[in-house]
């Protein structure tokens, strides 16, 4: 018996966040029936990304180069480091133009229940980077959740001789950065508090 490729495509699309069966079905039918060129471009771009995208050797951001464009940019403030949970948080902050320093991407947040430890988040690498790069200020831009707060607190407890602040203004309790508008994020960065 042959595979039902349409069904497989619909199932494959449901792995995307927020995409259920109905949305996946609409997307699949649109790509196959109305926009084959777009579908081919999507498939080629996705394949290229899967082959080429890696983590930056310095900040762990997703990039196609060993060192990302932000870490390579000498015009950025090399002494100010913003610690975020995910690459989407970097994109959200960058879209505001409100931060000119560099980043460290944890790729998650501490969660003992889920078995996510400081080592899983690269926190030992972060602490070595802060020391080695002579960082003067660390901005903790983790989500306003129990896990995000615990992650920020853990990092803060392990930092000495460096100014540490946490974004706060305008980020709702329980909120995640990727869902907050740019102006709110910019104000949160500007209104950060020392902890």
Identify what each model region corresponds to.
Residues 8, 35, 127-195:
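Long C-terminal interaction/binding lobes of large macromolecular proteins
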Residues 1-2, 144:
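A short, flexible low-complexity segment enriched in Lys/Arg and Gly/Pro that occurs
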Residues 24, 73-142:
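Extended interfacial segments that mediate partner engagement and assembly in macromolecular machines
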Residues 17, 36, 49, 61, ...:
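Conserved phosphate/pyrophosphate-binding and hydrolysis machinery centered on Walker-type P-loop NTPases
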Residues 38, 43-46, 57, 69-70, ...:
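Core recognition of P-loop NTPase motor domains used across DNA-transaction enzymes
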């Amino acid at each position: 018996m042959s595979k039902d490729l349409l069904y497989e495509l619909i199932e494959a699309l449901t792995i995307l966040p927020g995409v259920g069966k109905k949305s996946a079905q609409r997307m699949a039918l649109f790509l196959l029936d109305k926009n084959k060129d777009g579908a081919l471009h999507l498939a080629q771009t996705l394949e290229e990304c899967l082959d080429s995208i890696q983590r930056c050797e310095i900040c762990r951001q997703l990039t196609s180069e060993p060192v990302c464009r932000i870490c390579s940019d000498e015009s950025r403030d090399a002494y100010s480091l913003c610690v975020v949970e995910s690459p989407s948080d970097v994109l959200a902050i960058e879209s505001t133009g409100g931060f000119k320093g560099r980043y460290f991407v944890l790729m998650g947040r501490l969660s003992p229940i889920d078995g996510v430890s400081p080592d899983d988040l690269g926190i030992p690498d972060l602490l070595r980077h802060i020391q080695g790069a002579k960082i003067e200020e660390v901005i903790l831009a983790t989500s306003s959740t129990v896990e995000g707060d615990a992650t920020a607190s853990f990092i803060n407890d392990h930092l000495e001789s460096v100014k540490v602040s946490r974004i706060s203004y305008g980020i709702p309790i329980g909120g995640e950065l990727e869902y907050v508008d740019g102006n709110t994020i910019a104000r949160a960065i500007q209104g950060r508090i020392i902890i």
